[in-house]
């Protein structure tokens, strides 16, 4: 099954999104989800049966367009075209609605009308003038009619259908009243309804313009990220400095960056040193020092030194491109909380049309007359707002994920953003998560006839090609002492135990107590040393030669400066903290005590970590796992929420739901706080959207007027209310932009 993201064009409300989903999902081997806020289609389909063209034809059959690869520049261009078009239409509508209102209602307020327009003197001219003034307004709102009636014919009515039916009913009644003036009843000028149609269209155009502008602000995070990438870069070609477009950069090119310039792509510094502002990528406020050999990330700003770097990642492979992709995917995804709103939106418009018809018929048969019945009928149609329901969740998700990205917290889906605030237990991996993951060798104790430098040479030689941080500490110590590292043979890594290799004809084993026990190697002589080292928070490893204990090497990892503060924040939030590690119990307890962690699960093999998470979940705990994504991917995937600590350059950790780019544990609390704020915002939006419709529709239907002698809602006021209901939801979502991620 292929999974793709496309852009849908021509949608105006949640019912439109539902129509596209419905058209696609009725086909076998297609699973589609449409986000009205981002106008994105997430679709899975069998590539053997479908391709983009077939998917596009299905979408077009529902009355909408589909674009495969829409660049951000094209999106901005289309957005500006939409804003410009709405402005022009609104201006056209306003130019004609003002005289329309003056003629139709001015005389009621004592405003003077020329005699040829005076309804008491010339009722027909009075009616025809309003009809003529209404025509340009209808033209300004032509999309409501064309889309609305087309979707009605397709049996997928949308908000445009409600507007089209309501405005058309008002216009047709106006034409009928005009006919009556000519034929039988000059007093029919009292209820022409042209002004209702004109004002409804004008107000909804105004609301649509506000909605489009506000919706544009909700996606500002993506625009900021895209804006980080420079258009050009300076490279060295045949010894000559040359400026080229960034899309023409190749891996291996040497790029020149001067102070104040943006770094074009990811790379490794080959000349010079500087400090780099990575705040827009990671949220890190302080510049980061860089020297030869260090990695630089495209989109960051070179502060105070000229550097040359070799391009290592370009195009879609850069960190910035991956961040943009992850944020776009998250903003296009749906949170489970939106399901109820989606179900309601799917049936909303047909139900509203039914309520409007019942309302109109009920008032007419009650003896209130056609004019009153029509007024209530139109009011019900135009006050109903499926858009408020459809936008309630995705807009908050858009702003929330964008806010996270601005602060170095990449939330990969709407579901992750929704569920993170529920976390009650957090399990932390130790190495690279609580500690820096860069251990140093602290002790080397030799037994028997072996010398310390001899053991260090053996250990460093067999560990030389290992990528494990503990091995790196041993090798670095040997290199620092200029000890010769020699070749080895038959290397074998045993995860959770240690390593085995042949060195100069001897079998070497380096590992933990479990490894020694499995090989029945007597370690009694080292027990005291082992305990002392463990109690000091170090990780002791046994070295055996030909199945005899030769020594102990101890390595210690440095605790991150922010780890203790991060744990304190989480405990204040009422969250239980656990450290999960392969270290021995005493070492693990020492580290946990240093940072204030509640519980420790030690001596766990890598493959057992996910099982430990599962055991916690079986106790009805909502568990998050925090790790570096290297040897704890199964545990990250098993957890209710997997949180990966990034390193500023690795953001595509597949098994994680959230990636913390800054490698700062304090961002775990930030992610939880952001999730809570976003869910609160979504609930506010949903409450407002449901409350508005639940209260507004009965009010428009005249329930309060009929039974409680309350006010009667004019269709024009109903249109005003509907126009601002969506804007209010969007405005509330935008409040998240001011949320402080601490």
Task: Name each model feature, range by range.
Residues 109-124, 153, 172, 403, ...:
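Membrane-embedded alpha-helical bundles of multi-pass transporters
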Residues 88, 300, 424-467, 497-578, ...:
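ATP-driven catalytic headpiece of P-type ATPases
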Residues 60-76, 124, 130, 134-238, ...:
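Actuator/coupling domain of P-type ATPases
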Residues 5-7, 31-35, 39-49, 53, ...:
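Conserved cytosolic catalytic loops of P-type ATPases
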Residues 2, 38, 503-505, 537-539, ...:
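Conserved ATP-binding TGD loop and adjacent catalytic N/P-domain core of P-type ATPases
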Residues 149-154, 213-228, 395-414, 734-742:
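Juxtamembrane helix-loop transition segments at the membrane interface in multi-pass membrane proteins
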Residues 91-99, 340-367, 377-385, 391-395, ...:
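Bilayer-spanning, highly hydrophobic alpha-helical transmembrane segments
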Residues 1-125, 137, 224, 240-241, ...:
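Flexible metal-binding regulatory segments at protein termini and peripheral loops
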């Amino acid at each position: 099954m292929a999974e793709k993201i496309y852009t849908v064009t021509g949608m105006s409300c949640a019912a439109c999104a539902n129509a596209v989903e419905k058209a696609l999902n009725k086909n076998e081997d297609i699973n589609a989800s449409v986000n009205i806020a981002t106008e994105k289609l997430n679709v899975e389909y069998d590539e053997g049966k479908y391709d983009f063209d077939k998917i596009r034809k299905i979408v077009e059959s529902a009355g909408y367009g589909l674009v495969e690869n829409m660049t951000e520049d094209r999106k901005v261009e289309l957005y500006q075209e939409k804003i410009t078009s709405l402005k022009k239409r609104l201006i056209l509508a306003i130019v004609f609605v003002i005289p329309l209102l003056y003629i139709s209602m001015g005389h009621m307020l004592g405003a003077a009308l020329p005699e040829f327009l005076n309804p008491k003197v010339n009722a027909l001219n009075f009616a025809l003038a309003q009809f003529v003034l209404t025509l340009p307004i209808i033209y300004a709102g032509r999309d409501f009619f064309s889309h609305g009636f087309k979707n009605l014919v397709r049996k997928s009515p949308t908000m445009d259908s409600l507007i089209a039916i309501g405005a058309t009913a008002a216009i047709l009644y106006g034409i009928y009243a005009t006919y009556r003036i000519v034929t039988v009843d000059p007093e029919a000028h009292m209820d022409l309804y042209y002004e209702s149609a004109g004002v409804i269209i004008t107000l909804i155009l105004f609301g649509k313009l506000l909605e489009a502008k506000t919706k544009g602000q909700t996606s500002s995070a993506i625009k900021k990220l895209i804006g980080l990438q420079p258009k050009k870069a300076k490279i060295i070609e045949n010894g000559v400095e040359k400026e080229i477009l960034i899309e023409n950069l190749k891996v291996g090119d040497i790029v020149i960056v001067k102070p104040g310039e943006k770094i074009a792509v990811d790379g490794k510094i080959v000349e010079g040193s500087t400090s780099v502002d990575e705040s827009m990528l990671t949220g890190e406020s302080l510049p980061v020092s860089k020297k030869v050999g260090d990695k630089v990330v495209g989109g960051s700003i070179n502060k105070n030194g000229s550097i040359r770097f070799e391009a290592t990642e370009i195009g879609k492979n850069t960190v910035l491109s991956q961040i943009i992709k992850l944020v776009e995917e998250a903003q296009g995804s749906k949170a489970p909380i939106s399901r109820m709103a989606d179900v309601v939106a799917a049936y909303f418009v047909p139900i509203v049309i039914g309520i409007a018809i019942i309302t109109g018929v009920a008032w007419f048969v009650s003896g209130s007359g056609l004019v009153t019945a029509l007024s209530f009928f139109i009011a019900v149609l135009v006050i109903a707002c499926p858009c408020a329901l459809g936008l309630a969740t995705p807009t908050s998700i858009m702003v929330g994920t964008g806010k996270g990205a601005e602060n170095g917290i990449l939330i990969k889906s709407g579901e992750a953003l929704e569920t993170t605030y529920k976390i009650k237990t957090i399990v932390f991996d130790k190495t690279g998560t609580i500690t820096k993951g860069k251990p140093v060798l602290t002790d080397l104790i030799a037994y028997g006839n072996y010398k310390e430098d001899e053991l260090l040479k053996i250990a460093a030689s067999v560990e030389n090609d290992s990528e494990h941080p503990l091995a790196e500490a041993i090798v670095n110590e040997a290199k620092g002492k200029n000890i010769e590292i020699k070749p080895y043979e038959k290397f074998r890594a045993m995860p959770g135990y240690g390593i085995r290799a042949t060195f100069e004809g001897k079998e070497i084993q380096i590992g933990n107590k479990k490894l020694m026990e499995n090989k029945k190697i007597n370690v009694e002589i080292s027990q005291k040393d082992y305990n002392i080292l463990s109690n000091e928070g170090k990780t002791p490893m046994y070295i055996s030669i030909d199945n005899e204990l030769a020594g102990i090497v101890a390595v210690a990892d440095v605790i991150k400066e922010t780890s203790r503060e991060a744990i304190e924040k989480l405990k204040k939030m009422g969250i239980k903290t656990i450290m999960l590690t392969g270290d021995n119990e005493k070492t693990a307890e020492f580290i946990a005590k240093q940072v204030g962690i509640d519980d420790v699960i030690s001596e766990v093999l890598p493959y057992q970590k996910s099982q430990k998470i599962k055991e916690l979940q079986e106790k009805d705990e909502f568990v998050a796992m925090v790790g570096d994504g290297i040897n704890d991917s199964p545990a990250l995937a098993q957890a209710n929420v997997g949180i990966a600590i990034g390193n500023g350059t690795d953001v595509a950790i597949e098994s994680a739901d959230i990636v913390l780019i800054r490698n700062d544990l304090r961002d775990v609390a930030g992610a939880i706080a952001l999730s809570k704020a976003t869910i609160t915002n979504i609930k506010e939006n949903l409450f407002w959207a449901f409350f508005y419709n639940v209260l507004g529709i009965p009010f428009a239907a005249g329930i309060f007027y009929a039974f409680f002698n309350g006010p009667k809602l004019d269709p024009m006021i109903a249109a005003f209310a509907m126009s601002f209901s969506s804007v209010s939801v969007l405005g509330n979502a935008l409040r998240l932009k001011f949320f402080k991620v601490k």
